[in-house]
């Protein structure tokens, strides 16, 4: 029986885990079952990250009176 995956602590943690999965899968040395499990975990991490980004966008809309404005960063960052 498959165990439920624990949600990442943060967006940054999820992104780092996703990068690790991509790097491991790109190596081509992963057995099929491991690759399938990694793919599933990767899709769950992507959904988590998309949710966090959507939440952040919603917070920005609220802060800007429902008008999404361009964020000007100093020094072209």
UniProtKB/Swiss-Prot annotation:
Protein's GO biological process: DNA catabolic process
Catalysed reaction equations from the record: Exonucleolytic cleavage in either 5'- to 3'- or 3'- to 5'-direction to yield nucleoside 5'-phosphates
S-adenosyl-L-methionine recorded as keyword: no
A family per Pfam: Exonuc_VII_S
Protein name: Exodeoxyribonuclease 7 small subunit
Organism from which the protein derives: Chromobacterium violaceum (strain ATCC 12472 / DSM 30191 / JCM 1249 / CCUG 213 / NBRC 12614 / NCIMB 9131 / NCTC 9757 / MK)
Keywords: Cytoplasm, Exonuclease, Hydrolase, Nuclease
Keyword Hydrolase recorded: yes
Protein's job: Bidirectionally degrades single-stranded DNA into large acid-insoluble oligonucleotides, which are then degraded further into small acid-soluble oligonucleotides.
Principal subcellular localization: cytoplasm
Gene3D superfamilies xrefs: Exonuclease VII, small subunit
GO molecular function terms attached to this record: exodeoxyribonuclease VII activity
Gene Ontology terms: cellular component: cytosol; exodeoxyribonuclease VII complex
SUPFAM superfamilies according to UniProt: XseB-like
PANTHER family reported in the protein's UniProt record: EXODEOXYRIBONUCLEASE 7 SMALL SUBUNIT (PTHR34137:SF1)
Quaternary organization: Heterooligomer composed of large and small subunits.
EC number: 3.1.11.6
Membership in a protein family: Belongs to the XseB family.
Classification via InterPro entries: Exonuc_VII_S (IPR003761), Exonuc_VII_ssu_sf (IPR037004)
Subcellular location: Cytoplasm
């Amino acid at each position: 029986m498959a165990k439920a995956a624990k949600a990442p602590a943060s967006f940054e943690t999820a992104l780092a885990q996703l990068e690790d999965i991509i790097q491991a899968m790109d190596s081509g040395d992963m057995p099929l079952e491991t690759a399938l499990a990694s793919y599933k975990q990767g899709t769950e991490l992507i959904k988590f990250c998309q949710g966090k980004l959507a939440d952040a966008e919603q917070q920005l809309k609220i802060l800007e009176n429902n008008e999404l404005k361009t964020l000007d960063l100093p020094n072209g960052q």
